[in-house]
UniProtKB/Swiss-Prot annotation:
Cited function: Protein S19 forms a complex with S13 that binds strongly to the 16S ribosomal RNA.
Major location category of this protein: plastid
Cited PANTHER family: RIBOSOMAL PROTEIN S19P FAMILY MEMBER, SMALL RIBOSOMAL SUBUNIT PROTEIN US19M
One GO BP: translation
Keywords: Chloroplast, Plastid, Ribonucleoprotein, Ribosomal protein, RNA-binding, rRNA-binding
GO molecular function, one term: structural constituent of ribosome
Protein's recorded name: Small ribosomal subunit protein uS19c
Organismal lineage: Eukaryota, Viridiplantae, Streptophyta, Embryophyta, Tracheophyta
Source species of the chain: Zea mays (Maize)
The keyword Transcription regulation is assigned to this record: no
Family of the protein in this entry: Belongs to the universal ribosomal protein uS19 family.
SUPFAM superfamilies the record matches: Ribosomal protein S19 (SSF54570)
Subcellular localization, as worded in the UniProt entry: Plastid, Chloroplast
Alphabetical list of Gene3D superfamilies matching this protein: 30s Ribosomal Protein S19, Chain A (3.30.860.10)
Length: 93
């Protein structure tokens, strides 16, 4: 037997916010902490601010994003490169 495909996970509060905004004519930014929620076709065209651990990053949802997770589009880590403190390249004597 083959395995049954499970439904995509979407947080209930996020789904309620999407439905409420779809009823209105106006577009507004939807704020969420749910990075594990899947992107549904009902979310296309909305701007969702996703939490990255420090702040909310606004992401505009387009068609190719459907089926993926919200957290995939917001990086959580910031890379800082380490520069040498000395500017000269000559060896010290």
């Amino acid at each position: 037997m083959t395995r049954k495909k499970t439904n995509p996970f979407v947080a209930r509060h996020l789904l309620a916010k999407i439905e409420k905004v779809n009823m209105k004519e106006e577009k507004e930014i939807i704020v969420t902490w749910s990075r594990a929620s899947s992107i549904l076709p009902a979310m296309v065209g909305h701007t969702i601010a996703i939490h990255n651990g420090k702040e909310h990053i606004p992401i505009y949802i387009t068609n190719p994003m459907v089926g993926r997770k919200l957290g995939e589009f917001v990086p959580t880590r910031h890379f800082t490169s380490y520069e040498s403190t000395r500017k000269d390249t000559k060896s010290r004597r």
